[in-house]
Amino acid sequence: MIPHIKSVEPMGDFKLFVRFDEGKDVVYDLSDDIRDIAAFQELKTLPGLFKNARLDSSRTCVVWNERIDLPSDTIYEYGVSV
């Protein structure tokens, strides 16, 4: 089952606070993604882009633009529970 995201909030240091429908809250650190995935480097180099994180219409993906998205199952699995 693909987890649905209730809300996403960009934080400092390229971290996201994500709340899932079933009540789990996690902090997901994008530092490694920015370092390892070419498209994600725009989150660091384009001023203000990281703060524009939003949910797609299915609420199963955080998106920034047409090239950068992050699936909810990745966030759910690798995010740190808070």
What do the predicted segments below correspond to?
Residues 1-82:
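Motif-centric detector for short Cys/His coordination patterns
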